UniProtKB/Swiss-Prot annotation:
Family, per entry: Belongs to the PurH family.
Naturally occurring in which organism (per UniProt): Escherichia coli (strain SMS-3-5 / SECEC)
Keywords assigned by UniProt, alphabetized: Acetylation, Hydrolase, Multifunctional enzyme, Purine biosynthesis, Transferase
CC per GO annotation: cytosol
Protein name: Bifunctional purine biosynthesis protein PurH
Gene: purH
High-level lineage: Bacteria, Pseudomonadati, Pseudomonadota, Gammaproteobacteria, Enterobacterales
């Protein structure tokens, strides 16, 4: 499917001008006639390039403050004209063929992201002529090349040189795919923005208008193909959002190790999002999307040592996340002690990377330091639909807790309660977390009965010889019966933090009082399914 088409005339009109001068120079040097508009034309002319303004080409001036520039039959006829089929009509109307269109669109996303952006500002950054040219060229890809990404400039010049001034149909088709993806994403952004403006137009509160749009348009870019999915018989790929504003596994840089698997990415996300909850040096070890050890310490080495002690068996082959730079001492401790799939941290020292390089299969990721958590949406696919909700960024402080028992917690119990409450948010429901001295000592995850999660947490602590007496316990949701409190008391727990809200709260509180346990209500649940 060679079907080469020579590139003799190109129309260039870009908002993002990165690389456009060099690209235009390369085209001009190869005998390509340049047409252009507005700021792009002025820039090319300033650089000494022979460029024809579209208004001169069409004989019709730009008008309405630039709203109408390229919407003209001589432009779109030149793009849409089918070579060998529409030649006569093109000659009759003095329409010259345009073989390449180089366009990227007004920066709508960047405009509406600016603080104080008005609806009028947004509207003026809705591109009309650009998408029209892009779609016209993509539709007629059998004859015309459409270029919407500056990252394609170099490859296009190389192919023109290799093919005596022409581009192949395969290349034009691939460029057309990118073009349609580009305009689809652009229209989605505009639709989503206008959907968010419904309250302003209808005089309603956001609650009355609805938090979520009537039609949900999502745009993700493929970052990589995976060897397989969650299981070896499933195919998979990793897609990421554009313009992510928060350090994440999606934006992280892999500095060492073999390619990440589907499960690696899911587990690394769980570990990183958990470790972000802590201001102090912290370590989170995750296995199968559940934390199996979490601790804060005087250093990340101290935090790692303590997190590992929670459950060394489960830590084998786990994912380790830190909220400080990975240093050589900590890297050496990990490599000497256990098999690890992934280590992720804001950064890694050169000395640390030399140590981890000795284990070629260890994947090391750096994600940069994070600031405030960014609100967003979470999605869960169901057969035939998609569940959408706000990200669970909720967290309570000591001042928001309610003591509902006769006994008040000690200062250490309170610190441990707040610590394990943060961890419980990232454990699959039903979630129970035991903690003492700012480290987890037992985690019960994913049980259908809350009391069994409590029992498992106690069993794990006992198996590792960790002292439960005087510890705090967090439950991600309320206790429906007193049995969970009885199990915790039998293990040695002396403080419980939970949301409250059960019809049997009085019974549960009475059980805590019987055992001399301090109980704190958060009035906030953290189910995780």
């Amino acid at each position: 499917m060679q079907q080469r088409r020579p590139v003799r005339r190109a129309l260039l009109s870009v908002s993002d001008k990165a690389g456009i001068v060099e690209f235009a120079q390369a085209l001009s040097a190869r005998g390509v006639e340049l047409l252009s508009t507005g700021g792009t034309a002025r820039l090319l002319a300033e650089k000494g390039l022979p460029v024809t303004e579209v208004s001169d080409y069409t004989g019709f001036p730009e008008m309405m403050d630039g709203r109408v520039k390229t919407l003209h039959p001589k432009v779109h006829g030149g793009i849409l004209g089918r070579r060998g089929q529409d030649d006569t009509i093109m000659e009759e109307h003095q329409i010259q063929p345009i073989d390449m269109v180089v366009v990227n669109l007004y920066p709508f996303a960047q405009t509406v992201a600016r603080e104080g952006c008005s609806l009028e500002d947004a509207v003026e950054n809705i591109d009309i002529g650009g998408p029209t040219m892009v779609r016209s060229a993509a539709k007629n890809h059998k004859d015309v090349a459409i270029v919407v990404k500056s990252s394609d400039y170099d490859a296009i010049i190389k192919e023109i040189d290799a093919n005596e001034g022409s581009l192949t149909l395969e290349t034009r088709f691939d460029l057309a795919i990118k073009a349609f993806e580009h305009t689809a994403a652009y229209d989605s952004m505009i639709a989503n923005y206008f959907g968010s403006m419904v309250p302003a137009y209808h005089g309603e509160s956001k609650e009355a208008a609805g938090r979520f749009p009537r039609t949900l348009n999502l745009n993700f870019i493929k970052k990589q193909d995976m060897r397989y999915g969650e299981n070896s018989h499933q195919q998979a790929a990793f897609y990421i959002e554009e313009n992510v504003k928060e350090a994440s596994v999606a934006t992280a840089t892999q500095v060492q190790g073999k390619a990440l698997s589907y499960n690696n990415i899911a587990d690394t996300d769980a570990a990183l999002e958990c470790v972000k909850e802590f201001a102090e040096p912290a370590c989170v070890i995750v296995k199968h999307a559940n934390p199996c050890g979490v601790a804060i310490g005087n250093s990340i080495l101290d935090a790692y040592d303590r997190a590992y002690k929670t459950d060394p068996t489960s830590a084998f082959g786990g994912i380790i996340a830190f909220n400080r730079e990975l240093d050589a001492e900590t890297a050496q401790a990990i490599i000497s002690r256990q098999f690890v799939e992934v280590i992720i941290a804001p950064s890694a020292s050169e000395e640390a990377l030399k140590i981890t390089a000795a284990k070629q299969n260890v994947r090391v990721l750096t994600c940069g330091q994070w600031g405030e958590r960014v609100p967003g949406l979470d999605f869960k696919r169901v057969n035939g639909g998609l569940l959408v909700q706000d990200r669970d960024l909720g967290m309570v402080g000591a001042e928001e807790l309610r003591v509902v028992t006769k006994r008040q917690p000690s200062e250490q119990e309170l610190r441990d309660a707040l610590f394990c409450w943060k961890v419980a948010k990232f454990v699959k429901s039903n979630a129970i977390v035991y903690a003492k001295n700012n480290m987890t000592i037992g985690i019960g995850a994913g049980q259908m009965s809350r009391v069994y999660s409590a029992k498992i947490a106690g069993i794990k602590a006992a198996d590792e010889g960790l002292e439960v007496k005087g510890s705090s316990m967090a439950s991600d949701a309320f206790f429906p019966f007193r049995d969970g409190i009885d199990a915790a008391a039998a293990a040695g727990v002396t403080c419980v933090i939970q949301p409250g809200g059960s019809i049997r709260d009085d019974e549960v509180i009475a059980a805590a009082d019987e055992h001399g346990i301090a109980m704190l209500f958060t009035d906030m649940r953290h189910f995780r399914h």
